[in-house]
């Protein structure tokens, strides 16, 4: 309910009262409830909302995930039945509670994208991401993170056309265009050229050498080192 976000829950406590995974809808219903039994008493005697489990189960509606394009048909067999959320802190901020609320209700009917993924660290969801060039998609496919600079799986058949044909880079390749500090900073912060390298690396892993070389050359053409 709106009042839960407007007037309450700037911070919500998380306990491990239940030591098994609890389904995410049950968690949100528990927080949503105004029943005093769903509250924790603070030192000053006031009652506060809380989450009674640190392990939360997010069921995967596989047919919805396929129909909405979250997962490609070729990756059907890679999907897990349940995504397990592991809350690593003893409290969550309001924006983090909103993420749980969204996950509880989206039922895999539409993709969830983000550009900054580190908010997911507190949920243990970094291993359920797909890198699509300049954004990350939440997917029900487990891909353990080995390198903090290479978060998420890559579907090269999807990401390469995005980098090659969909994204626009303006006139950055024109030497007459002045790339000022802010342009260089933003492109560096977004690891803009690294996206080409990551997708090319996946193409190489699949032994698609010519495509990988072409993509790397394109990255240098669109964003030459003389500019960025």
Please describe what each predicted stretch is.
Residues 1-228:
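ER/secretory pathway lumenal C-terminal domains and tails of membrane proteins involved
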């Amino acid at each position: 309910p709106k009042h839960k976000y407007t007037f309450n829950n700037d911070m919500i406590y998380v306990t491990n009262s239940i030591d098994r995974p609890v389904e995410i809808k049950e968690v949100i219903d528990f927080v949503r409830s105004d029943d005093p039994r769903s509250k924790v008493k603070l030192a000053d005697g006031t009652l506060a909302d809380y989450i009674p489990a640190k392990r939360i189960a997010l069921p995967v509606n596989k047919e919805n995930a396929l129909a909405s394009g979250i997962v490609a048909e070729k990756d059907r067999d890679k999907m897990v039945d349940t995504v397990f959320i592991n809350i690593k802190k003893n409290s969550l901020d309001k924006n983090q509670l909103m993420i749980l609320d969204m996950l509880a209700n989206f039922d895999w009917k539409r993709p969830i994208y983000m550009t900054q993924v580190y908010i997911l660290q507190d949920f243990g969801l970094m291993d359920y991401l797909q890198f699509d060039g300049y954004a990350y998609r939440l997917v029900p496919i487990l891909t353990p993170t080995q390198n903090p600079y290479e978060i998420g799986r890559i579907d090269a058949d999807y990401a390469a056309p995005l980098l090659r044909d969909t994204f626009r880079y303006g006139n950055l390749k024109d030497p007459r265009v002045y790339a000022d500090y802010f342009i260089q900073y933003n492109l560096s912060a977004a690891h803009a050229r690294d996206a080409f390298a990551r997708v090319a690396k996946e193409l190489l892993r699949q032994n698609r050498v010519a495509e990988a070389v072409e993509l790397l050359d394109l990255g240098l053409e669109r964003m030459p080192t003389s500019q960025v």
